[in-house]
Amino acid sequence: MNIPVMPKSIISIINYQSDAIVSKQLLKKNNGTITLHAFDKDESLNDSTSPYDILIHVLEGTIDLKVNGTSNLIKTTEYFSLPAKIPYSIEAKEKTKVLLTVIK
């Protein structure tokens, strides 16, 4: 894991890939992880559940975050905190970069 010595734009760390979700783990510790995801438009992460609390932060773009069947439109600079063991899914409404923080 490379931690930059100088400030770096977080959205420049990862690039979009056509018809895919690209992931890059930025930090992995005993108490949690931080992962950057780049979703191409209409790509989705379906029926996920985390055993830990998570924070979903949209850095660029827009997602439809479904939690227990309820849609939440999350846009650039907005975030959503999700308790452990709650089912969720993410669909990118446009090309979107998301920072996912898991706290154990």
Residues of each region from the PLM?
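A short, N-terminal "cap"/entry segment at the start of jelly-roll beta-barrel domains
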Residues: M1-N31, K66
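Structural motif
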Residues: T33, T62-D64, P87, K97
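Short acidic-glycine-tyrosine-enriched beta hairpin
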Residues: G69-A84
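Ligand-binding loop in jelly-roll beta-barrel domains
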Residues: A84-K104
